[in-house]
Amino acid sequence: MKRALCAGVTAAALLYLPMAQAQIKVGIILSATGPAASLGIPQKNTSTLLPKTIAGQSVDYIVLDDGSDPTNAVKDMRKLITEDNVDLIIGSSVTPNSLAMVDVAAETKVPMISLAASAKIIQPVDDKRHWVFKTPQNDSLMATAIADNMAANGIKTVGMIGFSDAYGQGWHDEFSKAAAAKNIKIVDYEEYSRADTSVTGQVLKLMAANPDAILVAGSGTPAALPETTLKERGYAGKYYQTHGVANNDFLRVCGKPCNGTLLPSGPLLVAAQLPDSNPTKKVGMAYTEAYEKAFGVGTVATFGGHLWDAVILLENAAPTALKTAKPGTPQFRSALRDAIENLHEVPISHGVVNMSPTDHSGLDTRGRVMVEIEDGKWVLVK
């Protein structure tokens, strides 16, 4: 009887032990609908192109749409972890959603690779952000590129309008520092919501400040609204956008008014225009060719590249993690986190990654170029 009882207790206990699984499971949370859809749709498309095998293990990608809503992003993340037992979370597409997910990554000890831009997602690398990485360039890296270009063009004063959320605030914080270093003064700062349909009031205030240039700190198609409104009102200064607009949907919505606009971008956007010596060109062209073969010529967007790059990080980290533990276990997730943090000189479509315990983005100036919109096309500024 005692032996039978012990066997029963042992069997019951096994039900609560983490079970290794035969494949790597990746949960992907994207904003494929809602205000951020122009970012999330190319990422959703990219999810169909990802490798089915990594380091000899089959990979199961489970893709959910958070509708551009932070609450949904958190709910989706918990579902993927508790019900699907994923080893890695990739997402979300935008900063507010990704920031909301950071606590869940820390609580569950599941590594997360964000596809959003703000440095606040990964900085500082404290107990929470210990589990969080991201593939897009930090806004600080891109802000200095804009300030450098402004200074080279003799711009002394700037008006700024940005999203009334963490993306806009992060850009205001970082660009303020970059501008000050170049003796450029921000003479007015306005905010608007991603879902707003009019920014006339903000535009009138910007124009009253009479700046040499305007910087719009938005992402996706909603970033076109301030620029088109400024053009309608006759503002004739220089226009700058952030890397959050680097897709063809923005060009379609903004149209001719956006010709002449300058912005920093990951090198993927103009991969074909890069010199062959550029360390990102080969990866960028491979992604571009795969995407356009599936979805049509001219459809590639930088935002899809961030998902592609996240899986490149997984491909490089998984072999090391598999030496320690099997997928589906806390030990594997921890080993995978450690392996990602120790990646060095890994070329991705948006730069070359060198992670460290204090840097969970790992990108340097090789991860940015300046681009100008000319006749509705992206043109590398040389």
Language model regions located:
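Extracytosolic ligand-binding ectodomains
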Residues: A4, G8, A22-K382
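Repetitive helical segments and hydrophobic/amphipathic motifs
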Residues: A11-A12
